[in-house]
Amino acid sequence: MTGRHSPHRQTSPSPRPVEKMPRFQREHGASHRYTPMGKRPAAPANTGSHRGALLGRLNGDPERKGEFTAVSKLLKSRGYIPEARTALIEWVEKEGARRGGFEVMCGSILLPGHDESGRAIDDIFRDMSRSVRGEVASPIDELLFRVGNLLEVYVETTTGKPVPAKGLWGVVQVESTVTGIPKMIHVCLDRSLGVGYKCSFAKLWKKTIEELLGTGVGTTNPHCWFTRTIHSDAIQASFDGLNMIFELFGGRVRTGRVSPEGERRVFHTRCLGDDSFNALFAATVHDPTVSRAVFEARVRTVQTSYPAWYTFGDMWTPAPNNVGWVTTPEGSWCYDIRVRDLYNDPNKMSVTPAAAAPPGVPKPEHGEELEADPWKPSSTIGSPAPNLCALYTSGDSVELHAPLLPL
């Protein structure tokens, strides 16, 4: 996130604000030692780009002013990032909001266990995966594509208007096993579209899954509960060439990493209505005995690098060289970003190397043993684990592998 910085005038220093207790200390108790990542940057000087001056210019536009205030508060709650504030100011001054509200309509679709003949749906998907050759899309890619089209048809037929030409308006997420067998589909729509739940959605979903599988599945109504409306921090804020989604599916990555049956789960996400730069923030809970985790991103088109962000306590910090580092009082975690280009080389998974670490952070050794088994714990860390990380992605289809931690 970059933006032009206006020259700042010198002002008298303001009293240093009293920092709140870091979130993990509030949740785990104040007995945990806290080593801050660094000084929180000071507020920008009172120039024409200052927040107060900008709000004054937005007094005649309550909608844009409210949008700026809401997103600004959200950014502040995540930790003060000067680059984000600059980009936010430029966005408000130039374009304003392209998102309609904080409310989202969301729900889930549980894939049926068997078709009408009694054959297991898992077996059908497994056979489809084995038959995938060359340019043929995998079952998960097919689901992302077809459900995305389903939502577009549903929105347009329900509202009588086309989906927005710019900006994110919906998200589809396929939850699968680590072997690629789809289990559930999670969907989310911006409530500003004016879409409500209708029985036609279940009918569209039934037709979609039957066309994909080539067999009847009976009634799908009991498997679909696309009916929830939530007022959430899961919002989209559109900057110039940059769109951010905050914690949209974070809870599912966190709580659904391991299914009730003990299966590890993978989350495949497609953003609808936006082919620019998207940021999917995924909440995770880490095993403190694992000092290393790998997130895999599978994208349609590799357009740009993949910087990772992380939080420790209440502060967001950009990670260098596309590798997320988290320093704790007793050690550090390292997140590698793995990228697969589906168009140019679908079989090759490139790993972004861990180059320079932040000042004071020791660089983990990358030995042959680690490359062969990246999930093997290399040390024991007794401090609280970081509770949120993020992965920037480019393209319309993203596959996020939650860390494979010991069950």
Swiss-Prot record:
Q: Which domain of life is it from?
A: Viruses
Basic and acidic residues composition bias: residue spans: 17-30
> Which intervals of the chain are annotated as region Disordered?
1-62, 350-379
| Name of the protein in its database record | Uncharacterized protein ORF2
